[in-house]
């Protein structure tokens, strides 16, 4: 059997059914797979992927395999793995997979090491952990790598920092920055799946509660809109004036976190930064305040400080930990401060991941074809790929659009037409 470390191979049949279910909602990726099967653009290419091991990721892996790639996959978050999906990838599809839901940090990094043991020529990241390891403990692999792709905002931030410092050793495509990714996955996917995770973990009623959303990027906008749609009173906190202004114009209250802390019933961090909720806020929180994160790494809520401040802590439900502070107020942290939409729920719906993962597949193809001549920089997804994915998605939805007439094209190309 293919090399692997998954929790329970007996779950494979169940996982396959779920993968097939997700695939039905991923028509763009299915079309990419059909072409890949015929053209074999990834034939013999070793791809190492560190992604959330979900049914949607499985459909991406099958697409890459159909294109001829040799694959090794590990989880990009200790709590995001779907164990039945991981089992199916190994037993049903013979894809080397290293992922356990709830794995500790040691196992998490052992799994990354296992993927790097395949000596990938293309890396595929969600958070830049593979690339970080290659530039750290595994510099010996740099010569093998043609280039990489990065799925999420947090990873792109890390990679742009590496580029600025002149240490990025190969080109990387920022899949996150494609319009067909961040305008849909980040906003509609994160918005829906974050609320889904909160409700699955807590079974609370959001209507009438005050939800504080930290960060008003695409992910924060989605969370705020969905919370408002369920009847919550939404407060937004921001550090960037343009986004704060957008939040105000969208009808939300905007204020500093120091003012929001005593008002909120539920707090959702979606910033990609550290210590968004920290000791300055913990003492001001209401009794029963719920804290969760949807911004990738588990650093947005300062859990070390919260734990030190607590006189007692216990797990009260799956994915819900209670901290009792000095004056007796109870604070609840969901999913260990990790991505709540993947810790307590199933992540984004397949229909939105269809576009994100089509970007991944086509960016990998582009990197194989062009990566050896690209500078050691972070690149955006080529516009023609972005537009083709949008066209394919519209077609799969039965939506037709207009085209410019010859006269309209000439008008737009001319500078002589005025009032």
Q: What name fits each language-model region?
A:
Residues 60, 84-86, 110-111, 132-139, ...:
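Short acidic, glycine/serine/threonine-rich loops at helix termini
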Residues 31-34, 65, 119, 131-132, ...:
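Rossmann-fold NAD(P) dinucleotide-binding segment
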Residues 75, 123-127, 139-154, 273, ...:
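ADP-ribose/adenylate-binding Rossmann-like module
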Residues 51-69, 181, 185, 189-263, ...:
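Glycine-rich phosphate/diphosphate-binding loop of Rossmann-like nucleotide-binding domains
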Residues 2-42, 75-81, 86-209:
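Glycine/serine-rich phosphate-binding loop and adjoining beta1-alpha1 elements at the start
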Residues 2, 11-27, 42-46, 54, ...:
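Adenosine-phosphate binding glycine-rich loop
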Residues 69-82, 235-237:
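Short internal beta-strands
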């Amino acid at each position: 059997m293919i090399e692997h470390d998954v929790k329970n191979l007996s779950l494979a049949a169940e996982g396959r059914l779920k993968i097939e279910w997700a695939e039905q909602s991923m028509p763009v990726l299915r079309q990419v797979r059909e072409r890949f099967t015929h053209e074999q653009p990834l034939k013999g290419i070793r791809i190492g992927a560190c992604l959330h091991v979900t049914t949607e990721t499985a459909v991406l892996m099958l697409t890459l395999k159909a294109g001829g790639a040799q694959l090794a996959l590990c989880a990009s978050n200790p709590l995001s793995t779907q164990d039945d999906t991981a089992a199916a990838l190994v037993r049903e599809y013979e894809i080397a997979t290293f992922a356990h839901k709830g794995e500790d940090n040691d196992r998490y990094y052992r799994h990354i090491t296992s993927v790097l043991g395949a000596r990938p020529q293309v890396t595929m990241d969600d958070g830049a952990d593979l690339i970080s390891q290659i530039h750290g403990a595994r510099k010996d692999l740099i010569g093998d790598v043609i280039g990489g792709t990065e799925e999420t905002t947090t990873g792109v931030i890390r990679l742009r920092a590496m580029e600025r410092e002149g240490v990025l050793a190969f080109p990387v495509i920022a899949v996150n920055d494609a319009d067909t990714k961040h305008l849909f996955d980040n906003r509609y996917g994160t918005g829906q799946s974050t609320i889904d995770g909160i409700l699955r973990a807590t079974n609370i009623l959001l209507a009438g509660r005050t939800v504080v959303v930290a960060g008003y990027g695409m992910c924060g906008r989605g969370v705020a809109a969905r919370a408002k749609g369920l009847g919550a009173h939404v407060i937004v906190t921001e550090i960037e004036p343009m986004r704060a202004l957008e939040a105000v114009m969208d009808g939300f209250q905007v204020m500093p976190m120091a003012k929001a802390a005593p008002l909120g019933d539920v707090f959702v961090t979606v910033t990609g930064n550290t210590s968004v909720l920290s000791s300055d806020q913990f003492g001001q929180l209401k009794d029963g305040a719920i804290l969760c994160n949807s911004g990738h790494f588990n650093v947005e809520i300062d859990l070390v400080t919260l734990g030190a401040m607590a006189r007692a802590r216990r797990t009260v439900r799956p994915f819900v930990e209670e901290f009792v502070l000095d004056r007796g107020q109870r604070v609840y942290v969901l999913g260990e401060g990790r991505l709540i939409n993947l810790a307590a729920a199933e992540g984004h719906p397949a229909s939105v991941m269809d576009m994100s993962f089509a970007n991944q597949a086509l960016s990998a193809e582009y990197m194989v074809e062009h990566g050896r001549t690209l500078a050691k920089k972070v690149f955006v997804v080529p516009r023609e790929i972005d537009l083709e994915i949008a066209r394919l998605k519209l077609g799969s939805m039965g939506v037709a659009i207009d085209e410019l007439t010859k006269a309209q094209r000439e008008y737009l190309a001319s500078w002589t037409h005025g009032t």
